[in-house]
Regions:
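Helix-to-loop junction immediately C-terminal to a conserved catalytic motif
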Residues: 44
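ABC ATPase NBD coupling module
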Residues: 61-78, 103
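Conserved ABC ATPase "signature" region
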Residues: 108-126
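Conserved ABC ATPase signature
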Residues: 130-134
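Hydrophobic anchor residue at the start of the ABC signature
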Residues: 144
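H-loop/switch region of ABC-family ATPase nucleotide-binding domains
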Residues: 191-192
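Conserved beta-strand-loop-alpha-helix hinge in the C-terminal portion
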Residues: 211-234
Length: 277
């Protein structure tokens, strides 16, 4: 599913234009007060823009009409946040997911719940666990599984790496890759974790002062000089590669993981030394 925001005005944003590409991972990054979450709420139809066009798969929604079925749209666009509502803490995972399914008029289905949990790497034993006993990363996985249980075409993930260590980030990376490649999901990530974004995203929008500062291919964006006047961190691997280029005058293709970069350097050195024919 492709989503286009055309001349959207909402909050402090004026004439915002953005395209979320079908079956791709699009990242939206910016300072904490930049308005990323507002865009996430608009994309997931939880917040109605003041004006502009909201286009889904080339079908234009008239936002001025009162009969737009936002509830129907929420079947297709799932919004996942880190914080679990404290009112759900006493519920078991099964009770929580069953309630959420009922909100979307789905009948109780233990199989659907277990299948969704397995998609995010949680086994069936979790259905009897209370939300309050779960770790932050497990709660996020349950929130994601709950959203996946209604089978949305689009996933909007708000700050998904907030409570994750490096090993759990790697698991999330694999999960997002699975969602995109196997299940053909369109994924939006709102985050400032640029090291993670470099690994997982296809396309990036940078938000600064309630405007789009730059957007494009992840390598073009994260190596852009336009980021110098922002608080956005440059990924460590890009910092290293730029330092390597400055020291050696060797220009290599940008990579999103260390192993590929090391292979490129090794290949270049071997070729220069005559070790490769």
């Amino acid at each position: 599913m492709e989503i286009v925001l055309s001349d959207i005005s909402v909050g402090n944003f004026k004439k915002l234009n953005m395209c979320i590409f079908d079956a791709k991972v699009t990242a939206i990054i910016g300072d904490n007060a930049s308005g990323k979450s507002i865009i996430g709420e608009v994309l997931s139809t939880l917040r109605k823009p003041d004006s502009g066009k909201f286009i889904i798969d080339k079908n234009v929604l008239d936002l001025k009409r009162q009969d737009v079925d936002y509830n129907r749209l929420r079947f297709d666009i799932g919004y996942v946040i880190q914080n679990t509502d404290i009112t759900f803490f006493e519920r078991t995972v099964e009770e929580h997911m069953t309630y959420q399914l009922s909100v979307y008029n789905y009948k109780k289905s233990k199989k659907r719940i277990i299948d969704s949990l397995k998609m995010v790497g949680l086994d069936s034993s979790f259905i009897n666990r209370k939300i309050k006993t779960l770790s932050d990363s497990e709660r996020f996985k349950v929130a994601l599984a709950t959203t996946l249980s209604i089978n949305p075409k689009v996933l909007v993930l708000d700050d998904p790496t907030c409570f994750l260590d490096e090993s759990k980030k790697d698991n999330l990376y694999k999960l997002i890759k699975l969602m995109r490649l196997k299940y053909n999901k369109t994924i939006v990530i709102l985050s400032n974790d640029t090291d993670f974004i470099l690994r997982v995203a296809d396309y990036i929008y940078v938000i600064n002062n309630n405007k789009i500062l730059i957007h494009g291919n992840k390598y073009d964006v994260l190596t852009s000089s336009k980021l110098k006047n922002t608080n956005i961190n440059i990924p460590d691997i890009i910092k290293f590669q730029k330092m390597f280029e400055n020291k050696t005058k060797i220009k290599l293709e940008y990579r999103d993981n260390v192993n590929d970069l090391i292979k490129d350097i090794y290949y270049y050195v071997e070729k220069k030394s005559g070790g490769m024919k």
